[in-house]
Amino acid sequence: RLLKYYGAGFEYIVYPVASGDEDVAVALSNFVEEQDMGYLFLNITTDPTKPVDFSTLDQIKDNRSTKVTSLNSTLDPNFVLASNALGKYVEQPIGSNFNFIDQLGEVQPQDRYEFGYDDLAAYEKYNVATYAYENNTTPMITNGRSLSGVSTGIMVYKDYLTRTITNRVTDYLVQNKPPYNAATVKAIISIIQGVLANA
C-alpha cells in the first residue's frame, strides 16, 4: 500500500512520531531513502520534564531524505511545527535555506533559547530543527539540514532536477516516438543539458 501511495507523485510526507512510533518512523525513513525521491519530515514530540533523547535516530542518521523537527510537547500538541514549516518552505523558491523560516503562525517558539548549549547540542547532533529566537529577536528554525547533514534545499533541488529531466525526456519520447539510434541519444543529451543550463 505504501508503494502505491508513494507512486502517486508526492514530494513531501509529514509523519508525526508519537512515543512508541519510532520503529514506524525508522521504516518510513528507510523506505523514502531507498526510493531516492521525495522528502520525509518527521515531527517528534518530546517530554518537557525529561532531557530530549533522539537516540532512536541513530539507525537512520545517514539518511539524506529525512528532515526531523521537534518541539517540547506542551508547545506542539498538534504536531504543527513540521507542517507549518514545510508549508512556509514550499512557498519559497527552489533551493531556499530552510533555516530562515520564521513567523509560523500556529507554532509557539522556544522562549529566547531557554535551553542551554548542552541542550541545543542534543538537537544539533541529529540535525533536528526546533523553533527558537535567533539573536533574541527573530523566531527561526534552528537547523536546515537532513539527518545526514545535507542541506534541505539541496535535496529538494536535486528532486526538482530529477523530476524535470524525467518529464521532459518522457515527453520527447512519447510525442516523437524516435528510433533508438545515435541521433535520439544526442537529442536526449541536449534535453538534459538544457535543463541543467537553466537550473
Where are these regions (language model features)?
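Residue-level signal for functionally critical sites in structured catalytic/ligand-binding pockets
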Residues: Y6-E11, Y126, T184, I189
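Structured, hydrophobic secondary-structure cores that serve as assembly/anchoring elements
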Residues: A132, N136-A199
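Extended, charged amphipathic alpha-helical segments
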Residues: N72-V150, M155
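Generic structural signal for short, flexible, solvent-exposed coil/loop and linker residues
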Residues: L2, F31, L57-I60, T130, ...
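A glycine-rich, acidic short-motif signal
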Residues: R1-L104
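Helix N-cap and loop-to-helix transition residues
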Residues: D21, G116, N181-T184
